[in-house]
C-alpha cells in the first residue's frame, strides 16, 4: 500500500489556496477541469516520453486523475508523488496503488529531495500561490539529470485587451484576469535556473457559453462569490480586496448576468492564453 504524508511529514499543511477540494462544488469543478484538461496533458506526457520506471511528482494533484494516469504509465518500477494541501480526494488512490505516495502540504513550504525525479508537473495551481518562483526553484532542484518539468498555467492578457466587453464580463472577470500575469515569466525563470530545451507553447483560449468550460466557470464563480460575501462582512478584508482592484459588491451585483451569459451558446469572447512550458535538466 502506498503512503500518505501528513502535517508531520516533509511538508507542512496550511491553506493558502482558497478553494477546498472536499467541498461539493469544488469537487464538481475539479471534475470538469479534468475533463477539459486531461486529454491535452496526457498528449504532452506522451510527447515528453513519460514511461515505465519514471519517477514523477504532481504539484497540486487535486482530484488525482493525472496522478492515476501517471501511476498506470510508469508501472511498478516507477513512482508517483502527489502533493496537495487537501488530500481527501487523493487518499483512495494512495490506498490502492503501491507506486503512489500522497503528500499533504503547502507548496510554499515544499522541500522535495534533490535530484530525485524524472518529471515534475503542475497544472493551473502555481498562478494562485504567492510563492510561485520558489516552487519553480524547488522543481528544478529535485530533477534528476535528464529530468523534465512541465507546467500548464494561464495568462489573462487576451480578456484584458478586449475593448468592447459586456459589462458583466468586465466587472466579474476583469479583476480576475488582471492578476493572471505570472505564466508569461515561467520560461525565462526556468532558463535562468539552468534548464535546457525550454519551450513555451502558448495557445489562445476563448470563453464560450453553453460549454463544459463555461460550466466550469459557473462552479468557480460560485466559490469566488462565497469568498466575496464573507469579505463584505469584514471591513478589513474588504479593504484588502479593494486595494487589489477587486470590488466585492460590484462582482456580486453583476454575477447573475454573467452566469446567464455563460449559459448562452451565442456568447463568445477572447479570454485567456494557455502557457504549456517544458524544460530539461542537462544530463
Short names for language-model regions:
Residues 150-234:
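Conserved catalytic/acceptor-binding region of the Class I
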Residues 57, 62-110, 134:
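Class I SAM-dependent methyltransferase SAM/SAH-binding core
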Residues 19, 23-26, 201-270:
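C-terminal helical/coil "lid" or tail adjacent to the Rossmann-like core of SAM-dependent
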Residues 118-133:
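A short SAM/SAH-binding and catalytic strip from SAM-dependent methyltransferases
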Residues 133-148:
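A short glycine-rich, Lys/Arg-flanked "PGG" loop and its adjoining helix->strand segment in the class I
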Residues 14-38:
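Class I SAM-dependent methyltransferase Rossmann-like catalytic core
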Residues 109-120:
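A short acidic, Gly/Pro-enriched loop at the edge of an enzyme's catalytic core
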Residues 35-52, 69:
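Conserved alpha-helix/loop element of class I SAM-dependent methyltransferases that forms part
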Amino acid at each position: 500500500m502506498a503512503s500518505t504524508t501528513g502535517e508531520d511529514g516533509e511538508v507542512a499543511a496550511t491553506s493558502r489556496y482558497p478553494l477546498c477540494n472536499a467541498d461539493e462544488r469544488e469537487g464538481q469543478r475539479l471534475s470538469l477541469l479534468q475533463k477539459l484538461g486531461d486529454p491535452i496533458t496526457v498528449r504532452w506526457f506522451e510527447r515528453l516520453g513519460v514511461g515505465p520506471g519514471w519517477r514523477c511528482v504532481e504539484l497540486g494533484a487535486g482530484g488525482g486523475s493525472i496522478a492515476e494516469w501517471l501511476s498506470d504509465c510508469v508501472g511498478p518500477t516507477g513512482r508517483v508523488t502527489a502533493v496537495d494541501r487537501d488530500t481527501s480526494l487523493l487518499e483512495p488512490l494512495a490506498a490502492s496503488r503501491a507506486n503512489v505516495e500522497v503528500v499533504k502540504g503547502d507548496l510554499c513550504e515544499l522541500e522535495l529531495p534533490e535530484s530525485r525525479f524524472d518529471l515534475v508537473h503542475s497544472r493551473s495551481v502555481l498562478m494562485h500561490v504567492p510563492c510561485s518562483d520558489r516552487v519553480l526553484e524547488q522543481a528544478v532542484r529535485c530533477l534528476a539529470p535528464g529530468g523534465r518539468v512541465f507546467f500548464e498555467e494561464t495568462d489573462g492578457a487576451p480578456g484584458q485587451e478586449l475593448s468592447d466587453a459586456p459589462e458583466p464580463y468586465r466587472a466579474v472577470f476583469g479583476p480576475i484576469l488582471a492578476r493572471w500575469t505570472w505564466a508569461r515569466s515561467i520560461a525565462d525563470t526556468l532558463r535562468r535556473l539552468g534548464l535546457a530545451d525550454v519551450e513555451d507553447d502558448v495557445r489562445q483560449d476563448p470563453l464560450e457559453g453553453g460549454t463544459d468550460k463555461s460550466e466550469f466557470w459557473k462552479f468557480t464563480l460560485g466559490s469566488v462569490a462565497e469568498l466575496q460575501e464573507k469579505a463584505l462582512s469584514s471591513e478589513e478584508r474588504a479593504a484588502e480586496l479593494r486595494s487589489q482592484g477587486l470590488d466585492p459588491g460590484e462582482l456580486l451585483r453583476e454575477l447573475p448576468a454573467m452566469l446567464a451569459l455563460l449559459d448562452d451558446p451565442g456568447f463568445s469572447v477572447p479570454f485567456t492564453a494557455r502557457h504549456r512550458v517544458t524544460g530539461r535538466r542537462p544530463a
